[in-house]
Amino acid sequence: MKTHLRTIRCPSITIRWLLVLTLGAALPTAVTAQRADSPFPGGENPDGSLRPSARLTRLFTQDAYTEYTLLEPGSDKFRIRYFTEERRPGATELVNGTRGGSEGTDIEVYDPRTGKPLPFTYQAEDGGHAIHARLPRPVPKGGIGRVLIYKTYEDARTYQSYDKADARHDIRPGDITWVRSLAGYRRGVILPKGYAFLSSNVAAHVSTTSTGQLELHFANPSGLSNPLTIHARPTTATFTPTPYTDIFFDDVKTLYDLGAPESHTIRVDQIYSEYRKGSTPTLPLLGYAPLSDLRVIDLDTAKPLETSASGAATTVALGVPIVDDRQSAHLEITGTLSDPGYTVAGDMLKFDRTVKGLRNTILLPEGWEVASVSQAATIGVHEGRVFVALINLNAENQYRVVVTAKRRS
């Protein structure tokens, strides 16, 4: 069923929508036809058995990050902070299609490079509504467009509070539940102040924020849906902030592109967002991976940045200094690493290295097949070469991984 269409243009606005929606929206016809023609359509057969899904070809997943803050119990509202990207060269806008059944308010859109508001439109569309954010510049070739979106949803199906006791189900007045199917991205969920967890069915880190609220932090290595249900209850406990580094908010991803094994050389490519205040941050990667042929790119503009030595460290001169919490620099570091832990003996290749950060991918040379991996990982093929993709779910920011491979005859 079509909804009433209205467009509102401004950088920050409060909007309330009353939408008449069909709950079961079908996939677009073209996408459905594509999947029907594929031998790997994914999903389920009519009897509930699974159909094979497509092969993994992407070196990395989980580029977007979303944080949900549950607002006053009984309001049905939660505040969303969403970092997302647009990679199509020449694109001038980023579209955030939001879910049907929710009422959107208090939308704000920012440029993470400058921290300044961006113009956007928010419009009802068939079966839902969407934010169309105008990018500050067309996405350059070799670069990435990005935006920071804040919005508040009102959705009684997702966020429920209970005002009556139910001894049979151990419900007390004030209890809340929050249920959401969270597909594949890095996430955070913050409870209302004064609430404690009764249960959470997805493995996650737990921390206490500076405001004394409990927060879950997690990611899903499969990239598939996480049907999350949280039960929480008012508590008299007072929570004090805990030291915690949110590795799931950190978007760092490192590619180890293995060269000829006899050479011990690896082409390293790392992309991350720099949030530290200032104009000349150090490059942490070089502390554990000394690179030759070093190059640093500002991904907002696809232009190279100047680096310089500062004692034992290397710094980079940012295009825009970071002065507030909404700002970050989106950087890509590339270079060549000579690693004695990358060896070959006969027809057996071995990659043995301590890696850091949430996401690391090892891309094997052409003609090699994975024989073993010492850490939990997914395996795929990118442009004819096998890769091993790791997502670190532990709080420790480094771990040793050993990958062996055999050469095809």
Task: Label each PLM-derived region with a short phrase.
Residues 1-13:
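N-terminal secretory signal peptides that target proteins for export/translocation
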Residues 14-28:
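Bacterial N-terminal signal peptides
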Residues 33-75, 196, 227-262, 301:
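N-terminal, polar/Ser/Thr-rich
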Residues 38-49, 87-124, 179-203, 275-304, ...:
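Solvent-exposed beta-hairpin/edge-strand motifs
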Residues 56, 67-83, 138-141, 178, ...:
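Short, solvent-exposed beta-strand/turn "edge" segments of beta-rich domains on protein surfaces
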Residues 59, 128-208, 311-377:
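Surface-exposed, acidic/Ser/Thr-rich flexible loop segments
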Residues 76-86, 189, 264-274, 333, ...:
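Short, well-ordered beta-strand segments enriched in hydrophobic/aromatic residues
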Residues 213-241, 386-409:
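C-terminal beta-strand-rich structural cap/linker in extracellular carbohydrate-active enzymes
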